[in-house]
Amino acid sequence: MIKEKLTIIGAGLAGCEAAWQAAGRGVAVTLHEMKPEKYSPAHHLPGLAELVCSNSLRGESLENAVGLLKEELRRLGSLFMEAALATRVPAGGALAVDRGLFSAFITDKIENHPLIEVVHGEVAEIPADGTVIVASGPLTSDALAASIGKYTGDYLYFYDAIAPIVTSDSIDLSKAFRASRYGKGDGDDYLNCPLDEAEYKAFIAALLAAEKVAAKEFEKVVHFEGCMPIEEMAERGLDTLRFGPMKPVGLIDPRTGIEPHAVVQLRQENREGTLFNLVGFQTKLTYPEQQRIFRTIPGLGKAEFVRLGSMHRNTFINAPQLLLSTFQLKREPRILFAGQITGVEGYVESAASGFLAGLNGARLAKGEALIVPPSVTALGALVNHITSAPAKHFQPMNINYGLFPDLAGRVKKKEKRAKLAERALTELDGWMNTL
């Protein structure tokens, strides 16, 4: 008879990863998910581990810290990475997935694990006893948020914006061209809609004059830089978008032989290639304004939008003030947190925090010593930031090489990232032997 038990609230990326890791270590898991009885404003699929903002898990190269984090998770036996590799779609140098297949893959694995029981329905209170992982996500329900507040005190709010999706057969291929930046991947994984200078200026002017969805007065709007609405970026200056999501660098229009003034990139959304999302085009414009303005983009004049952009509230705790490096709550160590509610930002980071919370949740339930990954690994760097950053100005953060400890000695700039990755994977391999 299994005595060790673990309760996990939330079956998103972090909750599912935590459940999988804990169950794999012999701990019985009760995984609570409020869907399909109740949906957040941004979720639509009935399955577990739903991807909301984008279908991209970002770059695969170890030149990017997120690529290193994915490689670490893959080596550690992450369910998230297993699902991602099994359901990937073409995306140049990035790892992108068919989000429907991705959710179905993880749902099947979780529901068929003998030590995991999935309970559907909203959890309004953190259980009063036992080991608990709170992985309720950035869209935590009001009732549960109130319960969390009893343990954490004040928590912060910010908004992410969701990008639109169009059907591939509604894209005018006589105006758009296929190419990946610098020819990465298969070289034609993205559709690109080029804009000349006049078209770009008209587009910016339309964005600045467009009607937006108003935020409620009691909610403070704080945008995370990695998911900022395009109209907010446009307000920063004429060329801000041209140096951001609309940058033309590395993209040559085959009809002109030169780089366009600006480019809107469309990334394949599903395996069949029938849907494409507008890369970096998160927005809080009203639906009519989105359709009007985005159809002025060359190639999208008759675009069929299967999903328009929208805004939703995100909730996260002040992790440096509240959490230990083991993801335990300082004032009540039987409670752990995981996922975006901790202030990690991004799919991969959420899964990574779930991996570590699941590992330590299982150890806590079994009475074993808890562990923290080496600080030189991507996992360790992420943990260190989340739990050690200045609490006064704490904001969500993606993994990046700026969070890693410096290398010993002098290293050429162009070699630094490769050396950081090499050091991380060497340390990770040694750490894995202790698990």
Swiss-Prot record:
Its main location: cytoplasm. It is found in: Cytoplasm. Signal peptide: none annotated. This is Methylenetetrahydrofolate--tRNA-(uracil-5-)-methyltransferase TrmFO. The lineage of its organism: Bacteria, Pseudomonadati, Thermodesulfobacteriota, Desulfuromonadia, Geobacterales. Belongs to the MnmG family. TrmFO subfamily. InterPro entries: FAD/NAD-bd_sf, MnmG-rel, MnmG_N, TrmFO. It comes from Geotalea uraniireducens (strain Rf4). Its cofactor is FAD. Keywords: Cytoplasm, FAD, Flavoprotein, Methyltransferase, NAD, NADP, Transferase, tRNA processing. GO terms for biological process: tRNA methylation; tRNA wobble uridine modification. Its EC number is 2.1.1.74.
